[in-house]
Amino acid sequence: MFGGSKHIADYDYHVQKAGGDSNAFTNNDYTNYYITIPAPNIETALWLESDRMLALDFSQKSLDVQRNVVIEEFKQRYFNNPYGDIWLKLRPLAYKVHPYQWPTIGKNIDHIAGASLEEVEDFFHRFYAPDNAILSISGNITDEKALELVKKWFGDIK
């Protein structure tokens, strides 16, 4: 999601140029991508997010970079903290048949390392759609202006 789109090669460049920053986090029920940006540059954020939803660029290079990032996050969370791996052991005991039994970040390093580009694309196209998305805007912008910009940048996404 941070590797660019078919139209925008460097997502972070545009966010930073507009005075903002962006990041994401995931839990068992949702993934939150966010941009914090000065109000006069809200349209930049909406342009970037709509393009990411419409034209995400799937490449092996991007997958390899993000896979390494996730593996390092996995190590940090579970192996570089005292008793960090206890959650890997408790989840399957607490949730025998529920998807919560699996850590959001991946079951283990081999599981993460084995993710294929095809699996990532399939997941994206199945779950990253308007029916599964919530767009939230806050700040110094009127409701009318926010709605106008959302229609402009997201209105054609199906």
List each model region and its residues:
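Short acidic/His-enriched helical or mixed secondary-structure segments at domain edges of catalytic enzymes
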Residues: 71-89, 93
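M16/insulysin-pitrilysin zinc metalloprotease superfamily fold
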Residues: 3-5, 36-67, 147
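An aromatic/glycine/proline-enriched structural segment found at the starts
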Residues: 101, 134-158
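Histidine-acidic residue clusters that define the catalytic metal-binding segment
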Residues: 33, 92-133
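Acidic/histidine-enriched alpha-helical segments
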Residues: 16, 57-75, 142
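Buried hydrophobic packing residues in well-ordered domains
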Residues: 15, 33, 49, 70, ...
